[in-house]
Structure formats: C-alpha cells, structure tokens
C-alpha cells in the first residue's frame, strides 16, 4: 500500500487521526515535525526562532523525501503544503488526506497551546488569514474530511470509507 499523507492546518486533528489510523490499519505512523525535532535536536518553535521559517521549510522538504513511500502513515506539519514540490511529492507517492476544521474551532482548541510557533492567540484574524492562504493547497488532496465538531470515531469511519479499507 502506498503511504498515506495526512495534511491540514494546525489543530485540525492530524496527529490524533494519524495515530488512530495507524492502529486501525496496523501501519507505522511517522510525524514529520517530530522527526525534524529529533534530527535537529531542538523544538520546532526554537527552529523558527533561531533559524527562521524558510530554514524550517527546507528541513521539512528534506524530511518528507527521506521517509518511506509504502506502508506508512505520515502526519505532516501544517505548512508542508506551501511548497509545490512537497504537494507534488505526496500526490505522486501516496494518498493525500486533507483534514479540514473550521478555523474558529481550531483557534479555540489551540488557545492555551504554547508549542505552536505560528499561533498567537492575540491575533485570531492573522491566524484565519494564514489558514485561508493555504486552503487551495490543502484542497489539492485526494481525500477531504471535515473534522469540525466530529468525534475521532466519526472521522475514522469517513476516512476508512474514502480510502477503501
């Protein structure tokens, strides 16, 4: 089976759904952000602060290409889709799943999360604007799932049906 790439904006449920799908399909799950942190030996927020977003995006592209393209679920960072080369890679090497969630619901979920470098609770308008600027890229995915106000079980049932497992 080709890899399954789970994309979506921060807080949409990528990690949660990736883990649930991993258990359901008995496949390994790999998180690109976690792998970058392990390789660089620092937290994503520190990479952003010390090296900048462009350097982080380079690390992200390199990591994406280093991962297996068969029998693995890959949960991606929210911005991985900003680079056309990454979108092309994922579409050619697997099934791309876009988890959509209403940005206002995401903002509520992330209100107290200090680990998100691009989320500033004081500036919800900028958060929504960033979300909208990426939306067309996310929508290039093979499969779209709206996670807004749905349980993990509901999302999983819909996802399994769409990926035919």
Swiss-Prot record:
GO molecular function, one term: shikimate kinase activity
GO CC entries: cytosol
Binding residues annotated for ATP, in chain numbering: 11-16, 116
First-level EC class: transferase
Stated name of the protein: Shikimate kinase
Alphabetic keyword roster: Amino-acid biosynthesis, Aromatic amino acid biosynthesis, ATP-binding, Cytoplasm, Kinase, Magnesium, Metal-binding, Nucleotide-binding, Transferase
Self-association and partners: Monomer.
Enzyme Commission number: 2.7.1.71
Family statement: Belongs to the shikimate kinase family.
Binding-site residues, substrate: 33, 57, 78, 134
Cofactor note: Binds 1 Mg(2+) ion per subunit.
Function: Catalyzes the specific phosphorylation of the 3-hydroxyl group of shikimic acid using ATP as a cosubstrate.
Positions annotated to bind Mg(2+): 15
Pathway this chain belongs to: Metabolic intermediate biosynthesis; chorismate biosynthesis; chorismate from D-erythrose 4-phosphate and phosphoenolpyruvate: step 5/7
Species in which this protein is naturally found: Bacillus cereus (strain G9842)
CDD domains: SK
Needed cofactors: Mg(2+)
Subcellular location: Cytoplasm
A Pfam family of this chain: SKI
């Amino acid at each position: 089976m080709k890899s399954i790439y789970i994309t979506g904006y921060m807080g949409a449920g990528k990690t949660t759904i990736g883990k649930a799908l991993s258990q359901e399909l008995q496949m390994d799950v790999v998180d690109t952000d976690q792998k970058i942190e392990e390789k660089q030996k620092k937290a994503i927020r520190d990479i952003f602060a010390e090296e900048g977003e462009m350097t982080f995006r380079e690390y992200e592209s390199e990591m994406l290409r280093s991962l297996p393209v068969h029998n693995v679920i890959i949960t991606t960072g929210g911005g991985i889709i900003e680079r056309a080369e990454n979108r092309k890679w994922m579409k050619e090497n697997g099934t791309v799943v876009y988890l959509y969630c209403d940005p206002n619901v995401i903002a509520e979920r992330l209100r107290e999360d200090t680990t998100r470098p691009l989320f500033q609770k004081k500036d919800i308008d900028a958060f929504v604007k960033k979300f909208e600027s990426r939306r067309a890229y996310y929508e290039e995915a093979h499969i779209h799932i709206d996670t807004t106000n749905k349980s993990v079980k509901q999302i999983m049932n819909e996802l399994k049906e769409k990926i035919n497992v």
